[in-house]
A protein has these predicted regions:
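Alpha-helical segment of the N-proximal tetratricopeptide repeat
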Residues: 89, 96, 100-111, 121-161, ...
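TPR-adjacent "capping" and linker segments in tetratricopeptide-repeat scaffold/adaptor proteins
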Residues: 117-134, 230-236, 365, 440-446, ...
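Residue at a conserved register position within TPR or TPR-like alpha-solenoid repeats
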Residues: 142, 176, 210, 248, ...
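Alpha-helical repeat scaffolds
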Residues: 152-156, 183-194, 216-231, 253-265, ...
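TPR alpha-solenoid repeat register
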Residues: 168, 202, 236, 240, ...
Length: 584
């Protein structure tokens, strides 16, 4: 007995086999005491089932109030409503369950759709929508006072939560372009076009952005989607029609471009008429194109773009004095525009005019250094004349001024290095730019252009094995723009890699069999370079089946086919007769 009393757990009068129980935690747990030492805890499920709704209600109210306090006072969102906060938690749970079997993109689209239908309702989506509107207002106020850090902080979330707010989408897309995230920007603009069917300015911004980064395929797809939509305003329809026709022209699909011009009567406008003239010019019918352009200038005397095109064509034809007259007229008509000044550089060729060109370049940079397109045109002039110092200077200027299209300046500079014969520097610069691409977004066309230039640089630098591997990768990519392949072939010819150049031309035609511009350029390259002209007849026949080649091309082909090289070629005489017939 004395031993038991010494035990600290001993309870006087309670034996080791005695049992008793008592509830704790509001009766949800029962404690069963066996003897004076052993205690067993077991849940009381009936009591738990009875009290759990009460606890869940208390928890829901507490979390809702905490969330309301956080959003309303800590995050400073004055549009926060207590009713939304009380529905926020149940909506979140329901969303989580509904999204279990959905992918990331499906969840994003589902959430976006809900935000479009909750303007006058309550709950999680309604709160997020109101929160987005508030963030957009904060971002716009920050932009007005030039607080760009705060603007960038709020506009992204604001635009995401208000998908139908076109101004927010535009501002956020501009920010994405500025931060070198064009893919995100295009996605944002394209998803919001459905709300801009009566807003021509919004569509025009999208069209301009597509042309800025050579997104012809993207623009053609968008035009196909909205041209048949009766809800789209006539003004937007007209813009999409001419934009799609121009995109087809830039891709070399002359037949499709002419089809759109005829279908929508685009040649009744100055832009459409000019486009038809451009197609004739690029097809080789240059005298007819120039005559039609002169007729257009008589009909549209205020057509600045018509006069600009005439100056460019006269320059290409070698009529520099007449081109200068056109530029003088442009300078008088548009004294504040950079075009005439920059175009005048092309009229000062050769080393004797180097100092005059340098003076014009300095003047252009000093006067128009903040205009991105003007500086890009100036960089392209530097590329055509292989002035590496000029393209490098403008690439640095683009970084300093934080131009939206900075990567295009880098691309022009890389091509200029290659044109100047500095292949090793080209490779090193592209490798360095690829490190930058890990931070920025590049559209696929830009990446493929860099790949093509680096591939050619490997050949020019004597690294033929690496060049061959990269060339095979490039040609296996079915999405490479045709002009990238044609340009690559030209540069391979300059590097005297004729076999590789011919392989690229073959691939360019296989990937773009209906492309008249590609076929015409292939024929012209084969006429100019006998080393790749073994299959000239094949491509010439295909070109003649698609459209009538220019007189100059036919005459050059006639001379080439009359040479001894094609003496034993099959059907040579038939082809010669066909060419002579077209020349009559």
């Amino acid at each position: 007995m004395a031993g038991m009393s010494a035990d600290p757990h001993y309870v006087y009068g309670q034996g080791q086999s005695s049992r008793s129980s008592y509830p704790i935690l509001l009766g949800m747990v029962t404690v069963e005491v066996v003897g004076y030492k052993e205690r067993k805890y077991r849940p009381n499920f009936k009591r738990i089932a009875l009290l759990s709704p009460v606890f869940l209600l208390i928890l829901w109210v507490a979390l809702s109030e905490v969330n309301y306090f956080k959003e309303r006072y800590m995050n400073g969102i004055p549009t926060t409503r207590r009713a939304d906060m009380y529905l926020y938690l149940p909506d979140t749970v329901a969303n989580s369950v509904a999204n279990v079997f959905l992918g990331k993109e499906q969840i994003r689209l589902r959430e976006r759709q809900k935000l479009l239908t909750v303007k006058d309702s309550y709950g999680r989506s309604a709160h997020l929508f109101r929160k987005g509107e508030y963030f957009v207002s904060v971002a716009k106020a920050a932009l007005a006072r030039q607080d760009y850090a705060e603007f960038a902080k709020y506009i992204g979330t604001g635009a995401q939560l208000t998908p139908a707010n076109l101004e927010a989408q535009r501002l956020c897309a501009d920010l994405f372009f500025q931060f070198q995230r064009p893919l995100d920007a295009y996605q944002l603009l394209e998803e919001s076009l459905v709300f801009a069917k009566k807003d021509p300015d919004y569509f025009r911004q999208y069209i301009n952005r597509c042309f800025m980064l050579d997104q012809d395929a993207r623009l053609i797809a968008t035009a196909a989607r909205y041209l048949g939509d009766k809800e789209v305003s006539p003004e937007i329809q007209a813009d999409l029609q001419i934009a799609a026709a121009q995109a087809h022209f830039l891709r070399g699909n002359f037949t499709e471009a002419l089809k759109m011009i005829k279908e929508y009567q685009l040649d009744q406008t100055s832009d459409g008429y000019l486009l038809r003239c451009q197609i004739r010019w690029e097809s080789g019918d240059r005298p007819i194109a120039m005559a039609e352009l002169d007729a257009a200038l008589a009909a549209y005397p205020a057509g600045i773009r018509l006069l600009e095109m005439k100056a460019r064509w006269l320059k290409e034809s070698g009529e520099l004095s007449r081109a200068k007259d056109c530029l003088d007229l442009l300078a008088i008509s548009m004294p504040e525009k950079p075009g005439p000044l920059i175009q005048s550089l092309y009229l000062l060729p050769g080393g004797a005019n180097r100092s005059a060109r340098a003076a014009i370049v300095d003047k252009a940079i000093a006067r128009y250094g903040n205009q991105e397109q003007a500086m890009l045109d100036l960089a392209r002039f530097g590329n055509e004349t292989a002035e590496v110092d000029l393209t490098a200077r403008l690439a640095n200027l683009a970084k300093e001024r934080r131009f939206t299209n900075r990567v295009r300046f880098d691309l022009v500079h890389v091509e200029c290095l290659l044109n100047a014969g500095r292949a090793r520097e080209t490779i090193l610069l592209v490798d360095d730019l690829y490190k930058q691409a890990e931070r920025d977004q590049w559209v696929p066309e830009t990446r493929m252009a860099f790949e093509a230039l680096r591939t050619i640089a490997y050949f020019a630098d004597g690294q033929t094995e690496i060049g061959s591997i990269n060339l095979q990768k490039l040609m296996q990519n079915r999405k490479v723009p045709p002009q990238v392949l044609i340009s690559a072939s030209r540069k391979l010819i300059v590097a005297k890699r004729y076999d590789e150049a011919n392989d690229v031309l073959i691939q360019a035609h296989l990937q773009n069999e209906a492309n008249q511009a590609v076929l015409q350029q292939i024929v012209q390259l084969k006429l100019d370079h006998p080393r790749i002209a073994a299959d000239l007849e094949v491509y010439l026949r295909r070109l003649m089946m698609n459209r009538r080649p220019s007189k100059e091309v036919l005459q050059s082909a006639l001379r080439r086919l009359n040479s001894d090289v094609y003496l034993f070629s099959g059907n040579r005489e038939t082809l010669l007769r066909e060419i002579e017939t077209q020349l009559r």
